[in-house]
C-alpha cells in the first residue's frame, strides 16, 4: 500500500506522462511490494518556496505499512531525488521527503483494512 505524493511548483505541462508509471515500478522494486498496491499522486502548479526561493522545489511523502526506517529511507531518498531531478528538473537540495510507517489497521482498502 505504499503511497507516494509529490507537491511541486513545477507546472503540469512539464510533468512527463511516464512519471507516474516509472515511480510505481521503481517504488515496487525498492520496497519489494507489488506494483498493484502502490499509489502515486503528483500535485503540480503549487505556490511554494524552499529556502525563500520560488525556484523549482518539491515536498514529498512516502507512506507504507512497514519497509520504512533507517537505511531504507536513505535508499528511497536517493532513488526518488534522482527521479525527481531527471523528470521534473528539481535539484535534490530542493526536495524534502517525509516517511511514515503506517499501522495496517489504519489503512482502508477494498471495503476493509490491511490488518
Swiss-Prot record:
GO terms for molecular function: cytokine activity; dopachrome isomerase activity; MHC class II protein binding; phenylpyruvate tautomerase activity. Belongs to the MIF family. Pro-inflammatory cytokine. Involved in the innate immune response to bacterial pathogens. The expression of MIF at sites of inflammation suggests a role as mediator in regulating the function of macrophages in host defense. Counteracts the anti-inflammatory activity of glucocorticoids. Has phenylpyruvate tautomerase and dopachrome tautomerase activity (in vitro), but the physiological substrate is not known. It is not clear whether the tautomerase activity has any physiological relevance, and whether it is important for cytokine activity. InterPro entries: Macrophage_inhib_fac (IPR001398), Macrophage_inhib_fac_CS (IPR019829), Tautomerase/MIF_sf (IPR014347). GO terms for biological process: inflammatory response; innate immune response. Substrate binds at residues 33, 65, 98. Homotrimer. The keyword Cytoplasm applies. This is Macrophage migration inhibitory factor. The keyword Isomerase applies. It is found in: Secreted; Cytoplasm. GO terms for cellular component: cytoplasm; extracellular space. It catalyses: 3-phenylpyruvate = enol-phenylpyruvate; L-dopachrome = 5,6-dihydroxyindole-2-carboxylate. The active site is at 2 (proton acceptor). Keywords: Cytokine, Cytoplasm, Immunity, Inflammatory response, Innate immunity, Isomerase, Secreted. Its main location: secreted. Its EC number is 5.3.2.1, 5.3.3.12. Pfam families: MIF (PF01187).
